[in-house]
């Protein structure tokens, strides 16, 4: 019988990334809903990203960084990754 795949929700890295995204979003004066709309995702999903509940696709990370006017590498560095 196949083992269920492990969940990444709540991992230290995802929590750190979510915290960095939230801090950068607030510094840029975006609401959660406005940032979510800019990158084409639901606000509730954006909230999950910020809480470290979702393993974010690289394309969404790139869109988030671009919208916040930073490089993706800077976003990852802000999270300590």
Predicted regions and their residues:
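A short, Lys/Arg-rich alpha-helix, primarily the initiator
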Residues: 3-26
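Short basic helix-loop element that most often maps to the first helix and adjoining turn
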Residues: 19-34, 38, 63, 68
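Conserved hydrophobic/aromatic packing and binding residues within compact polymer-binding modules
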Residues: 21, 35-36, 46-49, 75
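Recognition helix of helix-turn-helix/homeodomain-like DNA-binding domains
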Residues: 40-54
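Short amphipathic alpha-helical segment with a characteristic S/N-K-E followed by hydrophobic residues
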Residues: 55-56, 75
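Hydrophobic micro-packing sites on short alpha-helices
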Residues: 61-65, 75-76
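Short C-terminal boundary/hinge segments that cap the last helix of small helical domains
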Residues: 69-81
């Amino acid at each position: 019988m196949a083992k269920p795949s492990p969940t990444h929700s709540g991992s230290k890295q995802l929590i750190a990334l979510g915290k960095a995204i939230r801090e950068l979003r607030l510094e840029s004066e975006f609401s959660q809903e406005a940032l979510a709309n800019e990158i084409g995702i639901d606000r509730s999903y954006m909230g999950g990203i910020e809480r470290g509940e979702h393993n974010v696709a690289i394309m969404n990370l790139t869109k988030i960084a671009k919208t916040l006017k930073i490089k993706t590498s800077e976003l990852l560095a802000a999270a300590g990754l």
